[in-house]
Amino acid sequence: MIISSWNVNSVRVRLNHILEYLKKKKPNFLLLQEIKTENKNFPYSELKEIGYDSEVHGQKSYNGVAIIYNKKINNINFNVINDDQEQSRTISVDINYQNELIKIICVYVPNGNPVDTDKYQYKIKWLKSFDKFLINQNKLKKKIIIGGDFNIIPNETDVYNPEDWENDALYRVEIRKFFRKILNEGYDDAFRLINKEPNNYTFWDYQYGSFEKNKGLRIDHFLLSKNISHLIKDVTIDKYLRTLERPSDHAPIKLTLA
């Protein structure tokens, strides 16, 4: 089974790229972030034409997440955590895979910049709420796959120039501690189980020739609860999509399960 995750930075602008990706890579699930559209304007019919259904938690012009799928799903939840700002950042579905009930969660974590504003405090509050949710899931021994744009650079090997990012909301010590806390509570960073090498990024700024110079960040992740991390067969970054005309500034990450 293949699950991909991609911050598309506008589903309407990137629709042709999405359709081609689905046809080429044939994931069973595609988790989208920053779709930047309301549900009524989501391209359901175009996706249906190539064999995919969609569950969408949209928002006008900002944020928004979706799960595109060609397998049976159950128990759709459009608000995994309580968000007092009512931003569209989470969606989850349950699936059966190899006789296991697994919850797939698509997340778009707040960016948090600038750090001296309410945006950073919102990110902290959001992460605390998400962590509380995961602790509860762990107590219930749930099997979880979390995929999405976490807006967190986990380690210095996940950013081209760590010194430049020390006070950024994606890399501050406080933020990285949240990521480690989640891992310590019973989750694995799927990519790092497979690939220990530095300079593997999922995001490159549109400016300064960042992609060509590989000045990027690894901020898009798959986290799996340890009770199913043995199913991980491979995790790759589909960087070729970043070379297309009018690309997203993120590349998809692809999780293959045995």
Where do the language-model regions lie?
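Surface polyanion/phosphate-binding segment centered on an Asp-His-Pro turn
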Residues: T236-A258
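Active-site-proximal beta-strand elements of phosphoester/diester hydrolases
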Residues: M1-S10, L101-D116, G147, H250
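Active-site beta-strand termini and strand-to-loop segments that position acidic
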Residues: N70-K71, V93-N99, S225-K226, S248, ...
